[in-house]
């Protein structure tokens, strides 16, 4: 995932807050990991409200502009909705499609998101454990972002372990 420095700088300037030193270091490290040939498997830790989502947003932005898709996995429907809204708002100025796959969607909406994910025509899909089901696939998955991985069950963790050998994984 190589990203034009110019686009990355423009996106960075749109961040409405000043980055903390730890945030800056984490963003640099994640971007460097994503440019290595081996899949990234990185954990970003920190207290609630200290900017982990912005680190994830920067990684997602880099992935999408590199022509790949992002799956954002949350343990609850409420948290998935929050991430969906954050990513949608933060990426609104860019040609990036963000969709939600959760219990808040109708069966028809879920089927549409799954079809678009499989075809590679949606850039970012935020969802719950449904993202790990057999009925969900991605045409060109490049990054999986996992929030609160410790809250997922054994079966889901096995699927996540498999993904770690195939695509970049960022856990928070």
Positions of predicted regions on the chain:
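Single conserved hydrophobic/aromatic residue that forms the stacking wall/gate
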Residues: 1-11
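Conserved pre-motif I regulatory segment
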Residues: 9-43
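Walker A/P-loop
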Residues: 38-59, 70-74
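Conserved SF1/SF2 helicase motif Ia
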Residues: 59-84, 94-96
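Loop/turn-to-beta-strand initiation segments
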Residues: 68-70, 97, 120-124, 140-142, ...
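Conserved helix-turn-beta segment of the N-terminal RecA-like "Helicase ATP-binding" lobe
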Residues: 79-116
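Conserved motor-coupling elements within RecA-like helicase/translocase cores
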Residues: 105-125, 135-139
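SF2 helicase catalytic motif II
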Residues: 132-171
């Amino acid at each position: 995932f190589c990203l034009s420095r110019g686009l990355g700088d423009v996106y960075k300037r749109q961040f409405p807050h000043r980055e903390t030193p730890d945030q800056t270091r984490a963003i640099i490290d994640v971007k460097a990991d994503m440019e290595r040939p081996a899949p990234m498997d990185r954990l970003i830790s920190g207290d609630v409200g200290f900017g982990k989502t912005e680190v994830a947003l920067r990684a997602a932005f880099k992935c999408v502009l590199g022509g790949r898709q992002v799956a954002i996995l949350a343990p609850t429907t409420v948290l998935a909705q929050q991430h969906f809204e954050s990513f949608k708002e933060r990426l609104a100025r860019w040609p990036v499609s963000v969709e939600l796959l959760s219990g808040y969607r109708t069966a028809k909406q879920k089927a549409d998101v799954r079809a678009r994910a499989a075809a590679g025509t949606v850039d970012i899909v935020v969802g719950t454990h449904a993202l790990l089901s057999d009925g969900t696939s991605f045409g060109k998955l490049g990054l999986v972002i996992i929030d609160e991985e410790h809250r997922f069950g054994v079966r889901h963790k096995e699927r996540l372990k498999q993904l770690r050998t195939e695509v970049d994984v960022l856990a928070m």
